Every structure is written in C-alpha cells, then in structure tokens.
C-alpha cells in the first residue's frame, strides 16, 4: 500500500470491510447520542433522490424512532430543495417513500439563487459563471436547511462520505456544511451495501451519482466531473491496489482540497503551508 494511501485511509476512518447491519446500528446510535448531547430537537436533511441522501435520511428516521422508544420527543424534517423543476423528481419521491420521514417540506431555491445572481451582476457588472452559480445553488440549499434548523432547534445532517471527502467533491459551506455526518468513513460501495441491507429500491443506489448543479451540463455525473470512477476510489480507500495514475490522481485531489476538510485557517495553523488548496 502507498504511504499516502495508508495515511488517507487512517484520516478518513475507512474500514476495508464492513458488516452492513452493524454499521446501521452504530450510525443510528451515533445520531441518537449526538442529538441528546447537543440538546437539539431532531434533524433536518435535504433529500435529492440519490444514494447518499437516501441513506442518511433513513438513518435519521430510524434515529428519531429510537429516540421515541427512549421517551425523547424528536422530529426529522426531510427537505426537498429543487432549483425550478428537478428533472429526476420521480427519484426524489422514491427516496422519500423509502425514508418515510415524519415530515417533508419543499423549498424551491430558484428565486434565492437568481436573487444572488442579480445582485452580483449589479455589483460587479458581469454574470456569474455557470460553475460559480452551481456553488451558489449548493450554498442556498444549506442556508434553507439552517433556517429550518435554527427555527426548530434541529441539527443539519450532511451526506459527505469517504469517497467524497478524499476528492473534496462537494461545495465548501454548501453541501459540505453540516452539523454531523452519519456517513463519514464509508466508501461509495459500502454506502450502497447499507442501502441494500435496509431494503432500499435498487434505483436509489444504481443510478449514476450526480450533483446536478450546472445549467449548461444538466445531469453531469460525478465520475465525468472527477475524471475518476467510484469503483477505483473505493478500491483506493479500502486499501486495495489501483493503477498508479489513478492513485496519483486521487492523492492529488486529496492534497489540493485539504482546506475543505479544515475549519477556517488562522495564523496559529500550519496545515496550509504544505499546500491544500484547490477548487
């Protein structure tokens, strides 16, 4: 195993093999213990219809049910956050039918995103790029979730897992902003195994993952964006041998996105002196 590969696996807490049933129990227990320690009233999570939010959502609902068994009143709000009309709305509804949240609400982010875009144009005399606008979409979605969380004393749940963390494939202070991460340490295929254990419809974990943030490239897959296959990323994270060019590409993305995995830098930090900057 490569030295940096071993360090990454350790830092991201990835296990080479897992027991899906035990992982579900452990992660639900984490959610239960954390919400009680925080003195919060439950969870809020944006549900898109993909693998990650489907899994995180089901874990949240199971945690709320566990809390009820312990005599603790808690709620879980699943939030639909479309930009105008979501092309894969059927998948989102399928995810909700699997998650079975106690409450579902919808916040259309289009006016918020366009408002930021209009103010940007007025202030700087230019339009945002499609990439910048995509990041605004992710950040407005998180603003909406924190508005709900702040009003109702809930915790915002993130969907980041090891395969995203190693590549930095999320928007800083967008989908990368959350109070807790119940999928942390899982590779993509391990998350899929948990969904299979939980009886999720195959569509939710077989569809090609996509952030779907770009107007000019709707439905662009994560793998096309990354230039890497999740199967290779998973092999790397699980300590398996991968082609050298693949390992180099993964390690380069990890080093370039270190800033995303850190709290804001201060003059007392030194992690940034060795690099750690990317998109």
Curated annotation (Swiss-Prot):
Pfam families: NAD_synthase. Mg(2+) binds at residues 52, 164. It comes from the Bacteria. Pathway: Cofactor biosynthesis; NAD(+) biosynthesis; NAD(+) from deamido-NAD(+) (ammonia route): step 1/1. One of its GO terms (cellular component) is cytoplasm. Its EC number is 6.3.1.5. One of its GO terms (biological process) is NAD biosynthetic process. It catalyses: deamido-NAD(+) + NH4(+) + ATP = AMP + diphosphate + NAD(+) + H(+). Deamido-NAD(+) binds at residues 139, 172, 179, 259-260. GO terms for molecular function: ATP binding; glutaminase activity; metal ion binding; NAD+ synthase (glutamine-hydrolyzing) activity; NAD+ synthase activity. Coiled coil: none annotated. This is NH(3)-dependent NAD(+) synthetase. The gene is nadE.
